């Protein structure tokens, strides 16, 4: 997920994919996610990588991640949290790996001190109330310290509305909440890949084609967005779109469909540009007309 200057929301750029075979004995999704994160960390040494996932991506596979990788996910209601391990006593025997067990999340929320926090989620600025607890989620991350962020939408009331956990101990509560909210761009990217790029429409039978077609389509989507961000963007793009559709008055930022449409027009124009002026053929005129009439194609 990256932030682009011409967009008010983060955008997801797929760079890796793995095949999951349903109803078969295969590697778990979490293990595959870990392998992709390790591959990305190896390709980007020295870069900080923040991974955000839903509650399904939490397990013992997350132990031993590189220091440059942080993991943020939703905390389960029945998660067993512990105090950090006490200092060594110097006595013989194995040192303790964890402290006393903490109360449940509901009990922690009753006694926690919630403070107002300004966050930007889904393109809007709002005020929520957060409380943090530094502890261990030993069943998942082992002895690694984590920060639990309890979120409450309203000032009044008891309990909490959302519980997040992160291994990024330097992140503020607002940053953790915003980071988790930005995960929604993954769902938007998958929808764009299916509806605009055509990922998943191929009818493949060969094993290699099944493994490569969808990742190739996702990479093409990423390359198209990168091209638009570096070379294709023009401030007049949105104004041009609103001129074509004057009833669409709320549009203020280009969409992925706009990016793909402009890339298509540029490719068509480059394809039919001649070295010397010549009369275009009816087929060429028809292709250009279709490209301009259907910018989302």
Model regions: which residues?
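Short conserved beta-strand segments at catalytic cores or DNA/RNA-binding microdomains
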Residues: 1-9
């Amino acid at each position: 997920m990256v932030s682009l200057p011409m967009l008010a929301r983060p955008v997801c750029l797929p760079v890796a994919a793995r095949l999951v075979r349903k109803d078969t004995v295969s590697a778990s999704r979490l293990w595959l996610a870990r392998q992709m994160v390790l591959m990305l960390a190896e390709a980007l040494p020295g870069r900080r990588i923040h991974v955000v996932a839903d509650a399904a991506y939490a397990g013992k596979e997350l132990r031993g991640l590189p220091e440059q990788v942080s993991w943020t996910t939703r905390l389960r209601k029945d998660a067993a949290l512990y105090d950090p391990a006490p200092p060594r006593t110097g006595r013989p025997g194995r040192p303790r790996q964890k402290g006393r067990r903490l109360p449940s999340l509901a009990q922690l929320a009753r006694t926690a001190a919630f403070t107002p926090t300004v966050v930007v989620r889904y393109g809007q600025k709002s005020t929520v109330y957060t409380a943090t607890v530094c502890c261990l989620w030993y069943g998942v991350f082992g002895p690694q310290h984590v920060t639990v962020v309890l979120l409450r939408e309203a000032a009044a009331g008891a309990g909490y509305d959302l519980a997040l956990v992160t291994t990024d101990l330097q992140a503020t509560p607002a940053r953790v909440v915003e980071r988790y909210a930005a995960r929604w761009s993954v769902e938007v990217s998958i929808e764009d890949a299916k509806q605009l790029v055509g990922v998943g429409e191929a009818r493949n039978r060969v094993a290699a084609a099944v493994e490569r077609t969808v990742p190739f389509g996702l990479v093409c989507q990423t390359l198209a967005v990168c091209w638009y961000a570096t070379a294709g963007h023009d401030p007049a793009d949105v104004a041009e779109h609103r001129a074509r559709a004057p009833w669409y008055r709320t549009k203020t930022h280009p969409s992925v469909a706009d990016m793909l449409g402009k890339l298509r027009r540029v490719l068509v124009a480059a394809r039919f540009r001649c070295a010397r002026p010549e009369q275009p053929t009816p087929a060429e005129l028809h292709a250009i007309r279709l490209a301009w009439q259907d910018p989302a194609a």
